């Protein structure tokens, strides 16, 4: 396409079209009266949908004109041409797509953040008098897609709506394809952005009084009408404030769900949540036209019912995608996803992004997992049955919206047939999640029987092709089919009969769409054609004829087939409407199937990866024996991952892992031990499947688990992996999963915070250090003593003394004021001094083995603080030139000889705070009198 400069030079007209006297690139610039009738109608429709790309049906193509033609040609890499639109206007830009390729091109446009208005022909062009009647039959936006080919099977496609009022906000979101519909309200403005980041909506509605109320902001586009608290990476549609009126929104919800009050769905006292939900419903009415969107009854949720994971934590823990390249492979979801249904895949993603806070609910999931782990043959049989169930949620959604085809309904019928088999399979189970499958709604059994008795086993893809309905379903349909068979039989016998009558052995009866049925005779025999033959076409080697009786039979076949297709479609519509009436019931069953699928998959992972069932409780303790990173261990050869234990936040010391056993030992005792290359690193899952939690045996006496661990060690030794490992184990446990450890006892966390790595934020002009400080400030302002905080390299993006000072004060604040369970990885070895000041701080290190000419990373976490980072060795391993490595060693020797960084602490008053500690020796606040903190 042409560069932007070319567009500007020609008033928006690409250079190639400017050469062809195209004067108007925007339909707003033309006088409608000067256009041809069809183009006048196009402009009228475009004015009604200025925010959307208008696809206008003309024959076998969907055409676009003016600015939309330029946009579509550019985005889809199509040929941009022009069309004559009248003497005054002349030619205008045009691009088109074949009608049969509509879905394929719409997918590309929707993925780029465009809305599309489909203006289709609503009458037969052959019967039209004058201009063919056209109407907008559908508006496709990123958040309202229901077509199967435009959706990812294993993730939701959410449409969201946000209403702000002061510091409070309301949020509603729905998946049009599955019918899910939720709303909430909160008073923390920072949380609205975090909730949108969790949902990753394809489109978000926002009320504004902006002049262009129908503007759609594509991802990254700026607008003065969009508040700072809303993330810019999403697609936003600006709507009128009136669309979110509380009175109208409330009335719309009551009418849609046939309610007398909103009290029963929990949002009667949440006006902003009601406004957001009502505004979302109005948008669906505007975009879906006559297509009904069967949403489930609105459900109200509360953010405080779930473990809070902010965007930074989801990114750093790589829950659904990797932080490096944003891919699925290598994420926690990838490592745990053994689901066999699309519904289960979507449910697992939701579970991982919304871990539970209720111990009882977590234990319900664990109980189900335990049954599935203990009985491998039962789990295998269950998964085999689940594999045969199609995507009930989206099939019900398409049926309810009137877009399901014959294959969709057959898939539903086949799925319903598996439900009684599933019910019999889980008849004796006790766990609540599997008990949900024991009851098969009789309405669905009856519906499945109806669908199977009416529809053929393999219906065609398109409803207009016929052959949908079985014989014997409708007497009129059977009669019409018999008539067609009779007439087609007559035509089939015509060829041998005419050969006998005419004596022309090469005579044939053929058919094409242009002429219908005809009789073909070679030109050399054309003089033998009977007088009742009517010549229709002359070709190089043959003459084509018709007869009155042949045309009569042909007309009867065509007319009867039209009647058959019409009647079949009517019967199919009745079946589809019947399915739509049961959409809510189908979705209830789908939710039970999805949950069972998730838990069966988690059980499979637990078996093959050697996971244990964590002992969950409402306390602050985090005790993990032989913990492992769930993703990294799957990426390494079996047994190569070195497990490590963790103890945080408890009142007693338990554990049979390295940390628990090592209390009271010298930190350097094991540093020269041989590295563990994987032998016996974790239980063999084939011989030791996880069952009930392994009791953690008491270790040597220790006053408490620390609230904060200062973790030091070499570069590339595995500190960041260890931090993520602890966070992922806690998250998995609160999802209800078993965890990669030999034993674990875990208290509920209200939030998990991570600050692991940082990069410049060029979009907002923030440096690496400023990004780091913003994330750290967020943690300090929101963490509680029930939070888990994982910090890596705080203060590294600025001068050494500044960074050390900040790291010290942050660690001190977390341990003494907040008392959050914290692991603080750092290369500031001076922070080891904190363990001698605050008695809820402990030092641990990732050990190495020193060899004469190299170091070996052992990846083992042991008590005690490291005094070296071995950064030069890490540089050598990374491939820095030998001369650079040698020079670095020389410089380091000189620095160590002439400089000493020491923290001068002097005795002071007892520090007042919540942490348990010895008397604190504090730095004198008066700079003139304080000791040298960083003396040289």
What do the PLM-derived regions correspond to, one by one?
Residues 2-6, 11-371, 387, 391-400, ...:
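Charged catalytic and DNA/RNA-contacting regions of genome-maintenance
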Residues 40, 44, 594, 830:
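Conserved phosphate-binding elements of NTP-dependent enzyme cores
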Residues 66-67, 270, 340, 351, ...:
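ATPase nucleotide-binding head domains, primarily ABC-like/P-loop NTPase cores
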Residues 244-249, 308, 323, 414-489, ...:
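Amphipathic heptad-repeat alpha-helical coiled-coil/stalk segments that mediate oligomerization
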């Amino acid at each position: 396409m042409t560069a932007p400069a070319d567009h500007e030079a020609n008033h928006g007209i690409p250079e190639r079209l400017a050469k062809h006297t195209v004067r108007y690139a925007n339909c707003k610039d033309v006088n409608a009266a000067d256009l041809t009738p069809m183009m006048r109608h196009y402009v009228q429709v475009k004015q009604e949908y200025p925010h959307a790309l208008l696809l206008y049906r003309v024959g076998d193509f969907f055409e676009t004109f003016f600015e939309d033609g330029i946009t579509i040609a550019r985005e889809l890499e199509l040929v941009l041409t022009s069309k004559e639109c009248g003497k005054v206007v002349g030619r205008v830009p045009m691009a088109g797509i074949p009608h049969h390729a509509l879905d394929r091109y719409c997918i590309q446009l929707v993925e780029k953040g465009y809305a599309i208005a489909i203006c289709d022909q609503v009458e037969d062009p052959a019967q039209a008098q004058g201009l063919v009647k056209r109407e907008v039959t559908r508006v496709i936006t990123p958040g309202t897609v229901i077509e199967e080919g435009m959706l990812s099977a294993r993730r939701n496609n959410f449409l969201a709506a946000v209403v702000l009022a002061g510091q409070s906000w309301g949020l509603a979101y729905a998946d049009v394809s599955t019918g899910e519909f939720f709303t909430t309200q909160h008073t923390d403005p920072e949380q609205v952005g975090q909730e949108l980041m969790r949902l990753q909506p394809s489109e978000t509605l926002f009320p504004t009084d902006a002049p262009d109320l129908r503007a759609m902001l594509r991802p990254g586009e700026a607008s003065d009408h969009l508040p700072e608290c809303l993330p810019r990476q999403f697609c936003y549609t600006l709507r009128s404030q009136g669309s979110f009126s509380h009175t109208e929104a409330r009335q719309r919800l009551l009418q849609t769900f046939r309610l007398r009050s909103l009290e029963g769905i929990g949002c009667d006292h949440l006006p902003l949540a009601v406004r957001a939900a009502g505004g979302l419903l109005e948008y669906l009415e505007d975009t879906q036209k006559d297509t009904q969107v069967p949403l489930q009854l609105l459900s109200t949720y509360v953010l405080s019912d779930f473990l809070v994971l902010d965007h930074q934590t989801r990114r750093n823990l790589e829950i659904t995608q990797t932080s490096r390249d944003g891919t699925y492979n290598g994420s926690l979801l990838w490592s745990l996803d053994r689901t066999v249904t699309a519904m289960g895949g979507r449910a697992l993603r939701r579970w991982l992004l919304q871990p539970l806070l209720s111990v009882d609910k977590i234990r319900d999931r664990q109980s189900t997992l335990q049954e599935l782990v203990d009985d491998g043959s039962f789990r295998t049989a269950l998964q085999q049955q689940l594999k045969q169930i199609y995507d009930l949620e989206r099939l019900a959604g398409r049926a309810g919206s009137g877009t399901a085809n014959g294959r969709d309904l057959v898939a539903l019928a086949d799925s319903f047939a598996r439900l009684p088999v599933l019910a019999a399979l889980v008849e004796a189970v006790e766990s609540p999640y599997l008990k949900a499958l024991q009851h098969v709604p009789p309405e669905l059994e009856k519906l499945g029987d109806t669908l199977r008795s009416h529809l053929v086993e393999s219906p065609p893809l398109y409803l207009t092709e016929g052959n949908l309905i079985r014989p014997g379903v409708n007497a009129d349909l059977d009669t019409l089919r018999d008539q067609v068979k009779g007439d087609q039989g007559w035509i089939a016998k015509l060829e041998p009969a005419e050969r006998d009558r005419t004596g022309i052995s090469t005579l044939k009866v053929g058919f094409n769409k242009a002429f219908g049925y005809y009789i073909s005779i070679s030109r050399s025999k054309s003089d033998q054609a009977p007088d009742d033959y009517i010549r229709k076409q002359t070709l190089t080697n043959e003459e084509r004829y018709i007869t009155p009786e042949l045309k009569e039979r042909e007309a009867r076949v065509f007319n009867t087939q039209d009647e058959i297709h019409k009647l079949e479609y009517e019967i199919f519509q009745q079946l589809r409407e019947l399915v739509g009436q049961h959409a809510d019931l189908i979705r209830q069953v789908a939710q039970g199937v999805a949950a069972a699928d998730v838990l069966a998959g988690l059980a499979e992972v637990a078996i093959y990866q050697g996971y244990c069932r964590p002992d969950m409780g409402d306390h602050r303790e985090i005790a993990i024996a032989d913990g492992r990173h769930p993703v990294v261990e799957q990426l390494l050869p079996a047994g190569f991952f070195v497990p490590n234990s963790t103890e945080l936040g408890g009142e007693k010391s338990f554990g049979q892992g390295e940390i628990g056993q090592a209390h009271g030992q010298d930190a350097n005792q094991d540093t020269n031990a041989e590295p563990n290359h994987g032998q016996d690193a974790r239980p063999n899952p084939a011989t030791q499947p996880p069952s009930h939690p392994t009791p953690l045996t008491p270790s040597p006496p220790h006053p408490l688990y620390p609230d904060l661990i200062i973790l030091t060690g070499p570069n590339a030794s595995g500190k960041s992996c260890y931090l993520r490992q602890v966070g992922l184990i806690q998250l998995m446990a609160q999802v209800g999963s078993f965890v990669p450890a030999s034993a674990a006892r875990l208290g509920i966390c209200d939030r998990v915070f991570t600050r692991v790595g940082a990069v410049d934020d060029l979009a907002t002009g923030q440096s690496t250090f400023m990004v780091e400080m913003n994330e750290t400030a967020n943690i300090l302002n929101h963490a509680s003593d029930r939070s888990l905080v994982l910090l890596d390299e705080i203060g590294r993006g600025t001068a050494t003394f500044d960074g050390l000072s900040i790291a010290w004060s942050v660690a001190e604040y977390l341990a003494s004021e907040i008392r959050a369970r914290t692991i603080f990885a750092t290369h500031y070895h001076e922070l080891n001094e904190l363990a001698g000041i605050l008695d809820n701080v402990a030092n641990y290190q990732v050990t190495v083995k020193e060899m004469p000419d190299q170091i070996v990373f052992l990846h083992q976490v042991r008590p005690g603080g490291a005094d070296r980072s071995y950064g030069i060795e890490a540089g050598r391993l990374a491939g820095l030139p030998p001369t650079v490595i040698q020079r670095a060693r020389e410089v380091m020797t000189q620095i160590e000889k002439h400089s000493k960084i020491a923290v001068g602490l002097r005795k002071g008053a007892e520090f007042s705070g919540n942490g348990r500690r010895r008397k604190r020796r504090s730095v004198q606040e008066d700079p003139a009198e304080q000791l040298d903190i960083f003396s040289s």
